[in-house]
């Protein structure tokens, strides 16, 4: 790590370093990058106006960090970080947990009814389905269910890489069940996240204690403009200095 061979370091070591230099979780300074601002603007618009939107961007462009910060500061906003192994019940149980609902048991029908009933009581709720491209088709169909039941009351934002757009367009073209409806409900529009810039990375470095210009340039080059990578490289620099 001290010699700059950062690509060879395993995840476990990065976690140890993060703990050791006091930069876990809340100690990492969030910077309003171009991607952060766009993601936040979409979430605000969707929640205030009960809109349904789809946002796509490269991995590491800052979508999830902006979402996490938004949810911490806005009532009735729920962040689902999806996983490939989720089935229908896993999806619904995780949404129940994010909403603070105690009862996460019952049939799929029961869970849907409980969630809809709870959301109908809330003022301007927002469901954020992060990494939606990891969901199987049958789970992604829940998007249609919640849209139909909560239209004009609950905002829904699908977030993913560009693969989601390709998948939905291809699904509609091949007349696969549900994809035409999904495409229609997001307004046939996928909002693109802006590319991370060197200025974004420099601002992140400076906000987190790295102000040496050479170090910032090195981090920028090695990061491939992936903000998760930037965080790791900042940790490594602080450890070696």
Regions found by a protein language model. Give the residues of each.
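Conserved AAA+ ATPase "SRH/arginine-finger" region at the nucleotide-binding site
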Residues: 80-84, 168-172, 176-183, 187-199
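A short helix-loop-helix "switch/interaction" segment in the helical subdomain of ASCE P-loop NTPases
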Residues: 215-229
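A short, basic N-terminal segment
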Residues: 1-50, 236-241
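Conserved NTP-binding/hydrolysis module of P-loop NTPases
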Residues: 18-22, 89-105
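Conserved P-loop NTPase "ATPase switch" module shared by AAA+ and STAND
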Residues: 118-139, 143, 147-150
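Walker A/P-loop nucleotide-binding motif
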Residues: 47-69, 83-84
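Conserved small helical "lid"/interfacial subdomain of P-loop NTPases
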Residues: 190-215
């Amino acid at each position: 790590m001290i010699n700059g061979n950062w690509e060879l370091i395993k995840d476990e070591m990065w976690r140890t370093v993060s703990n050791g230099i006091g930069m876990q979780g809340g100690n990492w300074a969030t910077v309003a990058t171009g991607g952060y601002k766009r993601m936040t603007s979409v979430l605000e618009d969707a929640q205030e106006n009960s809109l349904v939107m789809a946002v796509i961007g490269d991995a590491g462009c800052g979508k999830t960090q902006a979402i996490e910060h938004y949810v911490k500061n806005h009532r009735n906003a729920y962040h689902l970080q999806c996983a490939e192994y989720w089935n229908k019940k896993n999806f619904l149980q995780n949404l129940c947990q994010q909403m603070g609902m105690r009862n996460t048991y019952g049939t799929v029908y029961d869970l849907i009814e409980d969630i809809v009933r709870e959301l109908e009581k809330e003022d301007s709720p927002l469901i954020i389905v992060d990494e939606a491209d990891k969901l199987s088709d049958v789970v992604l169909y829940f998007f249609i269910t919640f849209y139909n039941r909560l239209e004009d009351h609950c905002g829904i934002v699908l977030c993913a890489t560009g693969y989601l757009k390709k998948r939905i367009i291809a699904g509609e073209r091949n007349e696969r069940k549900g994809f035409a409806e999904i495409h229609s409900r997001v307004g046939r529009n996928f909002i693109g996240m802006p590319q991370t810039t060197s200025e974004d990375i420099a601002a992140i470095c400076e906000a987190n204690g790295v102000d040496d210009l050479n170090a910032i340039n090195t981090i920028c080059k090695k990061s491939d403009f992936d903000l998760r990578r930037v965080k790791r490289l900042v940790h490594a620099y602080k450890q070696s200095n």
